[in-house]
């Protein structure tokens, strides 16, 4: 898998130059996502609670989708659907048609879902629940929670590894009651087949 790292500041400059009028202004680009095997670039506008699809050359905004709150993460399933989780105490998970970017479904998804990924081995969506301190496995066909797994405090990011058989979860805070905590927190590993 090839990863492309683009500084958010470069995307911010591109977004400013791509905005042709006031309603295209992007105040706070926050996250970048690649879809369609790296052919589509998406950026979030945190202040506008928007997901923006950029042109292939990165010079124009092709389409915007507005959500109930800021987008925290996005993934794509093998059918081309985009799955988005949004911030907030009553966080939401959205399913979008990958071509039209129209919202197909919207469900409540815990307290501040912070990351989402599709795992081909389990054929499930996995959602890190930051303030529930849980990892949820969700069936994309039914959008029902299949499993809730307790992980460390404030899980904020995750990645598949070992042939997609495991998930590495990064937690924002260590397991200690003090607020004087080090910057480095803890990592959890979840075996997707045995949970």
Mark where each language-model region is.
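Positively charged n-region of N-terminal signal peptides that target proteins for export
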Residues: 1-4
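Predominantly soluble domains enriched in secretory-pathway, periplasmic, or organellar proteins
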Residues: 14-195
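Bacterial N-terminal signal peptides
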Residues: 7-14
């Amino acid at each position: 898998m090839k990863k492309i790292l683009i500084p958010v500041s470069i995307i911010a400059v591109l977004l400013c130059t791509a905005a042709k009028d006031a309603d295209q202004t992007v105040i706070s680009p926050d996250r970048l996502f690649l879809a369609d095997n790296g052919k589509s670039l998406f950026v979030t506008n945190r202040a506008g609670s928007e997901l923006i699809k950029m042109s292939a050359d990165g010079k124009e905004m092709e389409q915007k989708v507005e959500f109930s709150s800021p987008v925290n993460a996005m993934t794509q399933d093998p059918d081309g659907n985009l799955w988005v989780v949004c911030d907030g105490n009553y966080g939401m998970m959205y399913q979008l048609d990958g071509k039209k970017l129209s919202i197909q479904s919207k469900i409540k998804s815990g307290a501040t879902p912070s990351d989402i990924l599709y795992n081909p081995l389990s054929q499930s969506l996995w959602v890190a629940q930051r303030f529930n301190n849980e990892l949820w496995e969700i069936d994309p066909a039914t959008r029902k929670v299949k499993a809730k797994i307790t992980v460390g405090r404030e899980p904020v990011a995750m990645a598949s590894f070992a042939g997609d058989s495991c998930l590495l979860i990064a937690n924002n805070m260590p397991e200690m009651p003090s607020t004087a905590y080090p910057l480095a927190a803890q990592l959890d590993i979840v075996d997707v087949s045995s949970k």
